[in-house]
């Protein structure tokens, strides 16, 4: 960046930019934020704005681009969304009063993890993560700068760190140590995170817990330091750090949550089709965020689960009160975000009016809960502090139609401040006086068209056309001459104008001062507002669970101290909602205390994966406090859920690999306990048949002998069903089918015992392969079954005359047949065969 012969203003820009080399610098110049040099070139392309230049006639004109200050937020959002940082340099003095260059300073650095004022309001958390390391120990801290939530935990390896970051869906990580090349590769490239470094620790420890382990303390303090360094202000809304252990909740890694579609549908990436979509009948932004958090972290504490269940039951038993409650919750705004705007000094009159509206709804919400007369609700009622003095202050002070801009006036209610009312009286009377002067001078002068107008340059003036200039009174003095008219003033008009201008200026200044005092007063209530937000959010989530329990016909699950699973006529709640209750076929899942493994066999696309997911989904719902889809449900409390459910029902995606299978299997057998739930679907399909079968059997045996976790193991290796005779805690189940008149119907019902057939050819028929091809495959299958051989039969000799195209006849005339002829189908897994069939079908 060339700096020779720069103007003082540009030199100021260069000096500031040196301090923030990794950020776009938005440099306030009047009504615009300007960008220069490379920032301008890059921003013009990213934001699709015009690229111009400063000093166009110079030998080396400086690239320049700009955005209006009043609409800058939408441009900042675009930059942040794409992973950039933005430094905001404001004018720190009035340019009209500045001597020399206007003083400018960076007042905030906005990063993907510190967005607090997006033009796209969202009910999701935006977590900023910090990690530090001490030997083999990792400290991971995270906070949401909007809600003020602040947490920390200790982890034993980098894989767990990455898993937690994925679970939080963080976009930015603050690093307190130097990453290895491999770690940087994972965080930056594989996880696409914005990486920021912070070596300093925050000195004010009032938000920290001195009992934390050293590495947890440093991760927390460096996160605080980074936040204060970028935000450059007091952050009174940040809550004291809360330490947690991942083992305090039902543990699920990112892959498990994705495969179960807990918070978003894995295929679409959208909310619809997820458990979150099913359970979300919340009415507030805080409630929606809390529900998402509950889904991410179901409980393992039976007492806390039952406490939630009991509130859901109360709401189910009080339909009309619950209906009133949901109506009242609709009047509640996002208190946490409003509190953060107060802390950041960005509150406008609209924010305060929303806060007052919310506070005015709280007594009604509290009264509804108290009216149910249930001791179960006492802890919720205690959190509903209406803060009446704050609601009274805002309602008395802020005008209902107040503008959003705090310098425009019209913010403060009449009657709130006596001095302000006097200024407003002068303005009102001044307007009347001007009307009286206009009428008096029109009558005295005889100029029928005489009128008083106003503009910023000339102030108030009499407008006289050229044809009437001869009638202008002697006490008029000329203020401006136009082509067809002239403007005049009088001493009386000037005096009134002076009084009005003084009153208007003093009124605006006083209103601003009053508003700032009110905003400061509101800031004293931030902690109480945050506690209220938590209480309302909890009420909102629990009423949402009650609504869903009623509309989706859910029942209250029971938890036993044993490991028995007994779910009668259970359903996959999300699939059922998508399909419709009339078409969904329920399944009973029963595993006695001495049964640890169900080995599931049956055709592809018959419902094995749905059956497995059904159990996991039911467990998650139960442990977050929700009711579950079944006629009855008795469950243990699981400490973790592990899944390897790949793309068995999503063949075209082709994302799973044998290595991923083995890594996820290893994760399960390394961390599962007897209190865990393991779901393995088609494990071993990504390698040769005997390799896959050997691995599948050894994994089953290991779980059976060394872990004892409740396990659903779906497999296409029918040979494994013989394990039931040697493993006393394993039972076979299968998906039932109905064969009638040569047609096969999948009943989607789980029944005891192993499957007797795989029905692979029938699945191929469903996939739409040609009838001649299927007929040939069926003939080969019959021949194999009769021979009892594991080798393919010899290919038929081609015939000069054939009535129909057979599987291998005349391959030279059909490229698909040629490809099929090359396949060693007897050393391929059913999954591999299905993938090939799908690809060939697409070529037809």
From Swiss-Prot:
InterPro entries: DNA_mismatch_repair_MutS, DNA_mismatch_repair_MutS-lik_N, DNA_mismatch_repair_MutS/MSH, DNA_mismatch_repair_MutS_C, DNA_mismatch_repair_MutS_clamp, DNA_mismatch_repair_MutS_core, DNA_mismatch_repair_MutS_N, DNA_mismatch_repair_MutS_sf. GO terms for cellular component: cytosol. GO terms for molecular function: ATP binding; ATP-dependent DNA damage sensor activity; damaged DNA binding; mismatched DNA binding. ATP binds at residues 602-609. PROSITE patterns: DNA_MISMATCH_REPAIR_2. GO terms for biological process: mismatch repair. Pfam families: MutS_I, MutS_II, MutS_III, MutS_IV, MutS_V. Gene3D superfamilies: 1.10.1420.10, DNA repair protein MutS, domain I, MutS, connector domain, P-loop containing nucleotide triphosphate hydrolases. It comes from the Bacteria. Keywords: ATP-binding, DNA damage, DNA repair, DNA-binding, Nucleotide-binding. HAMAP family: MutS. This protein is involved in the repair of mismatches in DNA. It is possible that it carries out the mismatch recognition step. This protein has a weak ATPase activity. Belongs to the DNA mismatch repair MutS family. This is DNA mismatch repair protein MutS. It comes from Streptococcus pneumoniae (strain Taiwan19F-14).
């Amino acid at each position: 960046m060339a700096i020779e012969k720069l103007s003082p203003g540009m030199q100021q820009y260069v000096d500031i930019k040196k301090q923030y080399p990794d950020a776009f610098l938005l440099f306030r110049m009047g009504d615009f934020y300007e960008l220069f040099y490379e920032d301008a070139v890059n921003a013009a392309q990213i934001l699709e704005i015009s690229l111009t230049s400063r000093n166009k006639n110079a030998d080396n004109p400086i690239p320049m681009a700009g955005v209006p200050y009043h609409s800058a937020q939408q441009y900042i959002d675009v930059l942040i969304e794409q992973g950039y940082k933005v430094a905001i340099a404001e004018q720190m003095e009035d340019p009209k009063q500045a001597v020399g260059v206007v003083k400018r300073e960076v007042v905030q650095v906005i990063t993907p993890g510190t967005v607090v004022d997006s033009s796209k309001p969202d009910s999701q958390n935006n977590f900023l993560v910090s990690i530090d390391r001490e030997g083999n120990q990792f400290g991971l801290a995270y906070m949401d700068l909007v809600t003020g939530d602040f947490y920390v935990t200790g982890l034993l390896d980098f894989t767990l760190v990455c898993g937690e970051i994925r679970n939080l869906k963080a976009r930015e990580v603050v690093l307190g140590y130097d990453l290895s090349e491999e770690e940087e590769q994972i965080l930056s490239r594989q996880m696409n995170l914005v990486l920021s470094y912070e070596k300093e620790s925050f000195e004010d420890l009032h938000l920290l817990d001195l009992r934390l382990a050293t590495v947890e303390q440093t991760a927390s303090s460096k996160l605080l330091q980074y936040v204060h360094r970028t935000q450059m202000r007091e952050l009174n809304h940040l809550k004291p750090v809360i330490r947690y252990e991942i083992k305090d909740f039902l543990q699920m890694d990112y892959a498990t949550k994705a495969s179960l579609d807990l918070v978003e549908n894995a295929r679409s990436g959208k909310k619809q089709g997820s458990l979150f979509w099913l359970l979300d009948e919340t009415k507030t932004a805080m409630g929606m965020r809390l529900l998402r958090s509950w889904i991410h972290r179901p409980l393992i504490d039976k007492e806390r689960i039952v406490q939630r269940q009991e509130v859901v039951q109360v709401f189910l038993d009080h339909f009309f009160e619950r209906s009133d409650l949901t109506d009242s919750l609709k009047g509640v705004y996002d208190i946490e975000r409003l509190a953060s705007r107060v802390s950041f000094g960005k509150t406008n009159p609209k924010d305060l009016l929303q806060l007052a509206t919310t506070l005015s709804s709280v007594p009604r919400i509290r009264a509804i809960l108290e009216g149910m007369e249930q001791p179960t609700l006492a802890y919720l009622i205690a959190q509903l502090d209406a803060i009446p003095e704050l609601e009274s202050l805002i309602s008395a002070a802020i005008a209902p139609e107040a503008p959003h801009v705090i310098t425009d006036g019209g913010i403060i209610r009449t009657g709130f401040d006596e001095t302000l009312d006097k200024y407003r009286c002068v303005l009102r009377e001044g307007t009347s006086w001007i009307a009286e002067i206009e009428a008096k001078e029109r009558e005295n002068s005889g100029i029928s068209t005489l009128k008083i107008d106003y503009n910023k340059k000339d102030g108030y003036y009499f407008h006289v056309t050229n044809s009437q200039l001869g009638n202008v009174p002697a006490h008029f003095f000329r203020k401006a001459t136009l082509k067809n008219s002239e403007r005049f003033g009088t001493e009386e008009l000037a005096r009134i104008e002076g009084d009005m201008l003084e009153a208007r200026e003093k009124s605006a200044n006083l209103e601003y001062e009053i508003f700032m005092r009110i905003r400061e007063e509101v800031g004293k209530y931030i902690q109480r507002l945050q506690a209220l937000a938590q209480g309302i959010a909890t009420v909102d989530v629990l009423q949402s669970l009650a609504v869903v329990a009623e509309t989706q016909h859910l029942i209250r699950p029971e938890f036993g101290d044993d490991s028995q699973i007994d779910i009668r006529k259970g359903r996959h709640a999300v699939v059922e909602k998508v399909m419709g209750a009339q078409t969904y076929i329920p399944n009973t899942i029963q595993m006695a205390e001495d049964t640890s493994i169900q080995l599931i066999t049956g055709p592809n696309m018959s419902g094995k994966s749905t059956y497995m997911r059904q159990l996991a989904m039911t467990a998650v719902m139960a442990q977050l406090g929700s009711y579950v889809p079944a006629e009855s449900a008795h469950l243990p409390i699981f400490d973790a859920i592990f899944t390897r459910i790949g793309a068995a029902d999503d063949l075209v995606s082709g994302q799973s690999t044998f290595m991923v299978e083995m890594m996820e299997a290893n994760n399960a057998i390394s961390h599962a306990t007897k209190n865990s739930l393991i779901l393995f679907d088609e494990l071993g399909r990504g390698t040769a048949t005997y390799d896959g079968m050997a691995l599948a059997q050894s994994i089953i045996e290991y779980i059976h002998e060394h872990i004892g976790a409740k396990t659903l193991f779906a497999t296409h290796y029918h040979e494994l069903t013989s394990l039931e005779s040697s493993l006393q805690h394993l039972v076979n189940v299968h998906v039932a089918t109905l064969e009638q008149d040569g047609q096969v119907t999948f009943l989607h019902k789980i029944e005891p015992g192993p499957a007797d057939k795989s029905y692979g050819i029938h699945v191929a028929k469903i996939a739409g392969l040609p009838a001649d091809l299927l007929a040939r495959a069926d003939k080969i299958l019959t021949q194999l079954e009769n021979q009892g051989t594991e080798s393919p039969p010899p290919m038929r000799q081609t015939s000069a005359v054939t009535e129909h195209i057979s599987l291998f006849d005349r391959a030279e005339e059909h490229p698909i047949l040629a490809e099929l002829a090359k396949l060693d189908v007897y050393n391929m897994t059913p999954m591999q065969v299905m993938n090939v069939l799908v690809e060939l079908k697409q070529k037809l």
